[in-house]
Amino acid sequence: MTTQVPPSALLPLNPEQLARLQAATTDLTPTQLAWVSGYFWGVLNQQPAALAATPAPAAEMPGITIISASQTGNARRVAEALRDDLLTAKLNVKLVNAGDYKFKQIASEKLLIVVTSTQGEGEPPEEAVALHKFLFSKKAPKLENIAFAVFSLGDSSYEFFCQSGKDFDSKLAELGGERLLDRVDADVEYQTAASEWRARVVDALKSRAPVAAPSQSVATGAVNEIHTSPYSKDAPLVASLSVNQKITGRNSEKDVRHIEIDLGDSDLRYQPGDALGVWYQNDPALVTELVELLWLKGDEPVTVEGKTLPLNEALQWHFELTVNTANIVENYATLTRSETLLPLVGEKAKLQHYAATTPIVDMVRFSPAQLDAEALINLLRPLTPRLYSIASSQAEVENEVHVTVGVVRYDVEGRTRAGGASSFLADRVEEEGEVRVFIEHNDNFRLPANPETPVIMIGPGTGIAPFRAFMQQRAADEAPGKNWLFFGNPHFTEDFLYQVEWQRYVKEGVLTRIDLAWSRDQKEKVYVQDKLREQGAELWRWINDGAHIYVCGDANRMAKDVEQALLEVIAEFGGMDTEAADEFLSELRVERRYQRDVY
């Protein structure tokens, strides 16, 4: 929109300030501009002169601190909703991302709420690793003056369900904190549990926290609203797929696709480091197979979110069919009295193993039963979008977004099975076909603000994706900082993703160094962590020169092996013992010089 600027003589801003203000508000809608106006009014009224007129100084108010520790955005959304609820109740509240929280100040907190997800094998989200480490260290203070509550989000298909929340809850209590409420562990379908928990938190805090003055509520409540867009997880953009290109060789064991999606004139914005959320539909053939195995027709009416739909449509659009869980196996066994599955009930490890190796449709195939349509629906979990690290920068591709998709395919007793979202993009969306997408912002995986800062990128396999975006951005910015890429995959000839682009960046001098690890091209397997150790001396020089280190890819094995290699390099070339090296790497993480996007 165009904003009419008053004559310069009437402005209290100098030309430079005016230019910065105009640049910051160019893309805002009228609603957003109105919000900004209210925000600055709140800031103005937060000045000492204004505060003098309030009933009590803010310093005397035991404010509420909400710490949001999010990996995919769900925890952040719950935390923001709670913040809004508390502001509506006129309570003094501050919301802070775990990565921005100065954790040494935790001893001075009075009322603390933690909303956290879990990643990998029970680890906290990336932005909360430093806080988690601090609380579990010898440096953790006594917290006898804190009252706290924890809301934990997880996925029951994983063994360490909600482990991060369990960790925070038990440690805060161990350090002397008082539980406001018992911890809540929420599964993938977390919305109802979150809504009920938020109401209980507000009720519990009303009796403990004084009411805030309106001006204070405006200022403290709005600080963390950074990203605004008409499109979201719940209201995705209907975009179109323009390119679906296989970028692994004919003889590769992997099927990796370069996907380009046209955003049209939506003005949907993203930054390198963000993720693309993709809502997919299940394979109609898979739906038909499952329905027929249960002796159903597919046209039976079922209720989904208050709407009546045919069973086939509900299964294709609304329910998760490609990821089994221990809960589903246990419930199916109990419901059908399956002689094969009933012995697994109550055996957590066996249930987890069965769910991990047996898709839902094959569970039904191996243990057939007859269910009615509603019983089937009640057994399943809601379909959730998949997130892919964005592999492009809008500085180069403008109204497009690119992702790098490893297509999941495997056999179960002679039948080919595939991942829900990856096979949707690779096999079922035709050129110019519709794809529902949204941006999941990730401020914990960002290029350095200073373009002169060196960058070290470690991304084997499809973990290369965000570094393609990084390089496009650095090239467009003509950033003078050095760039070093570590990439690995099984074979040079079949699996060198975006090979021509990396070679061009090297030739142009944009990519300063590239180290490649091909795990199957020689007798002894070589991985990126081996290359890190091999280049330890030079790596330490880059770190000493202020380099930022980025890691993307598998959380369970690769990321841990890479971190161990980094610790060894720091210890050897930095002349540190193991404990000092660990402290050094933790400090890099706090300084945002060590960032990971792992999954």
Swiss-Prot record:
Pathway: Sulfur metabolism; hydrogen sulfide biosynthesis; hydrogen sulfide from sulfite (NADPH route): step 1/1. Binds 1 FAD per subunit. Binds 1 FMN per subunit. One of its GO terms (molecular function) is sulfite reductase (NADPH) activity. One of its GO terms (biological process) is sulfate assimilation. The keyword NADP applies. It comes from the Bacteria. InterPro entries: CysJ, CysJ-like_FAD-binding, CysJ_Proteobact, FAD-bd_FR_type, Flavdoxin-like, Flavodoxin/NO_synth, Flavoprot_Pyr_Nucl_cyt_Rdtase, Flavoprotein-like_sf. It is an enzyme of class 1 (oxidoreductase). One of its GO terms (cellular component) is cytosol. FMN binds at residues 70-75, 117-120, 153-162. Keywords: Amino-acid biosynthesis, Cysteine biosynthesis, Electron transport, FAD, Flavoprotein, FMN, NADP, Oxidoreductase, Transport. It catalyses: hydrogen sulfide + 3 NADP(+) + 3 H2O = sulfite + 3 NADPH + 4 H(+). Its EC number is 1.8.1.2. Transmembrane segments: none annotated. Component of the sulfite reductase complex that catalyzes the 6-electron reduction of sulfite to sulfide. This is one of several activities required for the biosynthesis of L-cysteine from sulfate. The flavoprotein component catalyzes the electron flow from NADPH -> FAD -> FMN to the hemoprotein component. This is Sulfite reductase [NADPH] flavoprotein alpha-component. The lineage of its organism: Bacteria, Pseudomonadati, Pseudomonadota, Gammaproteobacteria, Enterobacterales. The gene is cysJ.
